[in-house]
Every structure is written in C-alpha cells, then in structure tokens.
Amino acid sequence: MDYNWLTVKAEARPAGEKGFGSFALQPIRAGETVAGFGGWVVDRVTLAEMPVYRQHRSIQIDEDLYLVSGETPEPGDMLNHSCEPNCGLLGSQLLVARRDIAPGEELTFDYAMCDASDYDEFRCFCGTPTCREVVSGSDWRDPAIQARYAGWFSSYLVRRIAALTAH
C-alpha cells in the first residue's frame, strides 16, 4: 500500500549526491498537483524515537505534528529540497507546480515551506544561485523567504507568519 502519491507525469530515480529525486516525464503545467503526502501522524517525541531514515521521510504538518511515510520508501517520498523550487505546498499535504515544469526537470520544493523544527538540518546540494548552503528549521523566519513563497507555505506556517507580522 502506498501512503504517498506522485503524478504519473513524473518518476523517482537516482539524483546524484542527493540520493533519489522525482523528475518530470511529461510537461507539467503551473498549478497542477504533482504529489500528495500521507502516512502516520506522530508528535515530536515519537518522531525522535523513530529511525533516522524514517525521520528524513517525514513532513511537519503542525506545531508538534509530523506526517511520517511508510516503512518502505515510495516514489512520493523522493522529493528534494531546492532554494529555487518549482513546486510549493497547497495546505499541508499536497505539492503543486509553482510554474511550468519541462520533461527532465527535477520536482523540488523548499523545505522552509513546511519545516519549522531543527530535527532535519542539512547541507544543501541544490547548487542554485540563491542556495542557502545549510537548510534549517528556522529558514521560514527570513522575511525574504516569506515574501518569495507567500501562498506556498504549510497551513501552520501561514498562521505563524501572520502572528509574527501582526506584531
């Protein structure tokens, strides 16, 4: 049983030093849903008790809640970070193309759109001109990132950003 969904217009395959990634097989139009995340909802304490490989295949969906994928990696798990992503979040569980994506392009999103915890800090390999080099759970606080990804953040981060800017 698959817990995640990846569009038939893409496939998961090796992505160099990033491990695996998902790549467009056909043109994908801006606004198309490309992936859906599913699995088990766990709190931070439970997530911390899980094996590291399971932690890396999770997505933060609320203040202290994480969606953890199944035991076996699935194509929908193979979505990498980029500091110049072509996809963004719709709500907390759907990934949507932010722009048209050509065949062969890797589907990516900026983990700042969903992660606000330090459980998954890592060195970035995206190689884009605006690469932050290190991705952390506090990146969403950067006003430039907030402006760049307005409308593409997870629902709970939208609430956090609104609370910050209200003061």
Regions found by a protein language model. Name each.
Residues 1-167:
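Conserved catalytic SET/PR domain of SAM-dependent protein methyltransferases, capturing the structural core
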